[in-house]
Amino acid sequence: MSLLHQARFFITVNHLRDLPATAVPEVAFAGRSNAGKSTAINILCNQKRLAFSSRTPGRTQHINYFSVAPVKAPDPLAFLVDLPGYGYAEVSGSAKYHWQGLLSDYVQTRQQLSGLILMMDARRPFTDLDCQMVEWFLPTGRPIHVLLTKADKLTNSDNAKALRETRKMLQGYAEQMETPVPMTAQLFSSLKRRGIEEAQGVIAGWLNLPEAQKAEARSAAEKSEPPAADPAE
């Protein structure tokens, strides 16, 4: 079982000064207000009501922290960080200004941040605001993994096209950097439970969770095994 299944609500933050003063790694989740971010977090953590989605898109304007640790552990091993959904027009100007500042400052300056999970609707990837998020985070040199959500809404051929075009866009961004930045993408569907294990593996690796260490050890052991002898020899 993934340790992500043990995630628990930790704190809600409305100002950078209130961020947890911890040194453990964090993975942030970002995306448009209607990209299915809260639903995806709940699915990845195998919980129904860990991350709440507002009935009115764009109303969740805080940063929510979820701790990841075994049930009886005294301290978190890591944090999942649910960032405010962006891009919804009904938010007032002053709230939007504060919200955008909170988002940009967090992703650009948070030293504990190990990587960004960027959620995009597979039908409408790379909106202007999605591109803005990539451009804010890219200079940090940390990895970005795109979840193309709501893949169940598309045909197989349209999904393949969306994934191909997304990877091409990410490659274009990566080529702008002097030092290579890991940028990957996958298809994801909360409804069809598609892509869950792949996404969990990425997150566990970034957070250096025990399950990722075990998977790495198994992979190393398999690579070190001598090839099977040819029966003909």
Curated annotation (Swiss-Prot):
<feature type="binding site">
    <location>
        <begin position="187"/>
        <end position="190"/>
    </location>
    <ligand>
        <name>GTP</name>
    </ligand>
</feature>
<keyword id="KW-0547">Nucleotide-binding</keyword>
<feature type="binding site">
    <location>
        <begin position="82"/>
        <end position="85"/>
    </location>
    <ligand>
        <name>GTP</name>
    </ligand>
</feature>
<keyword id="KW-0342">GTP-binding</keyword>
<keyword id="KW-0131">Cell cycle</keyword>
<feature type="binding site">
    <location>
        <begin position="58"/>
        <end position="62"/>
    </location>
    <ligand>
        <name>GTP</name>
    </ligand>
</feature>
<feature type="binding site">
    <location>
        <position position="38"/>
    </location>
    <ligand>
        <name>Mg(2+)</name>
    </ligand>
</feature>
<dbReference type="InterPro" id="IPR027417">
    <property type="entry name" value="P-loop_NTPase"/>
</dbReference>
<dbReference type="GO" id="GO:0005525">
    <property type="term" value="F:GTP binding"/>
</dbReference>
<feature type="binding site">
    <location>
        <begin position="31"/>
        <end position="38"/>
    </location>
    <ligand>
        <name>GTP</name>
    </ligand>
</feature>
<dbReference type="InterPro" id="IPR006073">
    <property type="entry name" value="GTP-bd"/>
</dbReference>
<dbReference type="GO" id="GO:0046872">
    <property type="term" value="F:metal ion binding"/>
</dbReference>
<feature type="binding site">
    <location>
        <position position="60"/>
    </location>
    <ligand>
        <name>Mg(2+)</name>
    </ligand>
</feature>
<dbReference type="GO" id="GO:0000917">
    <property type="term" value="P:division septum assembly"/>
</dbReference>
<feature type="region of interest" description="Disordered">
    <location>
        <begin position="214"/>
        <end position="233"/>
    </location>
</feature>
<comment type="similarity">
    <text>Belongs to the TRAFAC class TrmE-Era-EngA-EngB-Septin-like GTPase superfamily. EngB GTPase family.</text>
</comment>
<feature type="domain" description="EngB-type G">
    <location>
        <begin position="23"/>
        <end position="209"/>
    </location>
</feature>
<keyword id="KW-0717">Septation</keyword>
<dbReference type="InterPro" id="IPR030393">
    <property type="entry name" value="G_ENGB_dom"/>
</dbReference>
<keyword id="KW-0132">Cell division</keyword>
<feature type="binding site">
    <location>
        <begin position="149"/>
        <end position="152"/>
    </location>
    <ligand>
        <name>GTP</name>
    </ligand>
</feature>
<dbReference type="GO" id="GO:0005829">
    <property type="term" value="C:cytosol"/>
</dbReference>
<protein>
    <recommendedName>
        <fullName>Probable GTP-binding protein EngB</fullName>
    </recommendedName>
</protein>
<keyword id="KW-0479">Metal-binding</keyword>
<comment type="function">
    <text>Necessary for normal cell division and for the maintenance of normal septation.</text>
</comment>
<dbReference type="Pfam" id="PF01926">
    <property type="entry name" value="MMR_HSR1"/>
</dbReference>
<keyword id="KW-0460">Magnesium</keyword>
<feature type="compositionally biased region" description="Basic and acidic residues">
    <location>
        <begin position="214"/>
        <end position="225"/>
    </location>
</feature>
<dbReference type="InterPro" id="IPR019987">
    <property type="entry name" value="GTP-bd_ribosome_bio_YsxC"/>
</dbReference>
